[in-house]
From Swiss-Prot:
Chain ranges passing through the membrane: 240-260, 270-290, 304-324, 431-451
Disulfide bonds: 156-170, 220-221
Function of the protein: Component of neuronal acetylcholine receptors (nAChRs) that function as pentameric, ligand-gated cation channels with high calcium permeability. nAChRs are excitatory neurotrasnmitter receptors formed by a collection of nAChR subunits. Each nAchR subunit confers differential attributes to channel properties, including activation, deactivation and desensitization kinetics, pH sensitivity, cation permeability, and binding to allosteric modulators. Forms heteropentamers with CHRNA9.
GO molecular function: acetylcholine-gated monoatomic cation-selective channel activity; calcium channel activity; excitatory extracellular ligand-gated monoatomic ion channel activity; serotonin-gated monoatomic cation channel activity; transmitter-gated monoatomic ion channel activity involved in regulation of postsynaptic membrane potential
Superkingdom of origin organism: Eukaryota
Glycosylation sites: 42, 58
Protein name (Swiss-Prot/TrEMBL): Neuronal acetylcholine receptor subunit alpha-10
Cytoplasmic topological segments: 325-430
Record carries keyword Lipid biosynthesis: no
Signal peptide positions (record): 1-26
Regulation: Activated by a myriad of ligands such as acetylcholine. AChR activity is inhibited by the antagonists alpha-conotoxins RgIA and GeXXA, small disulfide-constrained peptides from cone snails.
Length: 452
């Protein structure tokens, strides 16, 4: 008999493979069912899977930070989305993979096997839900790996002393709730948490997530209890607070010294100070609402309080200076020390000059630089005639003229006195304006320096 052609042989082999493939898959399924039945025939998930009950079972933990959902500074609670991986060896669930068609691993519900009761010690969730019920990966050598996502709420001590330029350290402490260190040896797989799949947060920047293993002995028990603590290093993104809270405060605080530059007769000097004070009070309330009620005052809060104190002082000084400005003709003369210090030295230093005066020349002590001199007929006693042809017998007329001249002199003296007090007020306004400008500048530099 002649041999069959080569194409016919290839077609027959391909058809045979097509027919046998479903049969192989069905065989694998039957072997997997048989494996599952054989493994859990006499298995109890309530007992710790250790061949020697005197030895501790090694459990490794690795946490992956996926997202920071919320940081509640007022209640001091951090809400985060984590992927928690736990791995251990269950000697009761090992099999020979050659006896089961080469099956090396299976995925089964986590409720089928024993699981370590690893919980978040500093949990702040009222429901205390824990991890999701996900499958575990069981390998032929008995190693079990359990990956489960979890949304955790952990307590975090928030220090707002340098808000909005602050950084926080939030700890996530994982440990067994009932097993001590002689029964479960909990260790971290890596020295840091995994941040490769982290979704960036708009408010917080994650600087790192180091992991440390601690062994703690509590007062209730003599056995040691190991735990793994992940420290989440956070730094606040301050741009939002700079543009919405800090810069408006700086600009408003620079308005306070300008109140001294307003003319005293405008009637708006005190109104400006009170308006600025009310605006800062509103911003202070906005900061207080978002901060936890603690003893530590935030940096921006200190800046607000210092600015409000400065504006209060400037408003009080404005009222005092306005009282000097409007003292009127009946006021006493300017004291010599005030005339020398304010009208001479400070006025020249601050270039506060009246019309026709020069800031470089000192004023004369007698007149204080106010008004023209007495005309040449004043100061002559009534009754004396400057010329020989004076009609001295008109005593009544001369007496009246002398009286009018005296009233005019007293009126001019009162006017000069009031003008001097007005200039004193103007010099003090200019002096305090520069003093408060310097104070605002120094406070702003201090805030920026502390932030750096």
């Amino acid at each position: 008999m002649g041999s069959a052609p080569l194409p016919a042989c290839l077609l027959a082999l391909s058809l045979a493979g097509t027919v046998l493939a479903p049969g192989c898959g069905a065989a694998q399924g039957r072997l997997a069912h048989k494996l599952l039945h054989d493994l859990f025939a006499n298995y109890s998930s309530a007992l710790r899977p250790a061949e020697d009950t005197e030895r501790a079972l090694n459990v490794t933990l690795q946490v992956t930070l996926s997202q920071i959902i919320d940081m509640d500074e007022r209640n001091q609670v951090l809400t985060s989305y984590l992927w928690v991986r736990q791995a251990w060896l269950d000697a009761h669930l090992a099999w020979d993979k050659d006896a089961y068609g080469g099956i090396d691993s299976i995925r089964i519900p986590s409720s089928y096997v024993w699981r370590p009761d690893i919980v978040l010690y500093n949990n702040a969730d009222e429901r205390f839900g824990g991890s999701m019920e996900t499958n575990v990966v069981l390998r032929s050598d008995g190693h079990i790996m359990w990956d489960s996502p979890a949304i955790t709420k952990s307590s975090c001590k928030v220090d707002v002393s340098y808000f909005p330029f602050d950084g926080q350290q939030c700890r996530l402490t994982f440990g067994s709730w009932t097993y001590n260190g002689n029964q479960i040896d909990l260790r971290n797989l890596l020295d840091t948490g995994d941040l490769t799949d982290f979704v960036e947060n708009v408010e917080w920047e994650v600087l790192g997530m180091p992991a440390t293993r601690n062994v703690v002995t509590y007062g209730c028990c003599s056995e040691p209890y190991p735990d793994v603590t992940y420290t989440l290093l956070l730094r606040r993104r301050a741009s939002f607070y700079i543009f919405n809270l800090l810069l408006p405060c700086v600009m408003i605080s620079f308005l306070a010294p300008l109140g001294f530059y307003l003319p005293a007769d405008s009637g708006e000097k005190v109104s400006l100070g009170v308006t600025v004070l009310l605006a800062l009070t509103v911003f202070q309330l906005l900061v207080a609402e978002s901060m936890p009620p603690s003893e530590s005052v935030p940096l921006i809060g200190k800046y607000y309080i210092a600015t409000m104190t400065m504006i209060t002082a400037s408003t009080a000084l404005t009222i005092f200076i306005m009282n000097i400005h409007h003292c009127g003709p009946g006021a006493r003369p300017v004291p010599p020390w005030a005339r020398r210090l304010i009208l001479h030295h400070l006025a020249r230093a601050l270039c506060v000059c009246e019309v026709g005066e020069s800031c470089g020349r000192p004023q004369r002590e007698g007149t204080g630089g106010m008004g023209p001199r007495d005309p040449p007929g004043e100061g002559v006693e009534p009754g004396l005639c400057p010329r020989s042809r004076c009609l001295c017998h008109h005593h009544a007329v001369l007496s009246s003229v002398g009286y009018i001249a005296g009233v005019f002199r007293r009126h001019r003296t009162a006017q000069r006195r009031a003008a001097e007090w007005k200039k004193v007020a103007k010099v003090m306004d200019r002096f305090f304006m520069w003093v408060f400008f310097l104070m605002v500048f120094l406070m702003s530099v201090l805030v920026i320096g502390k932030a750096a």
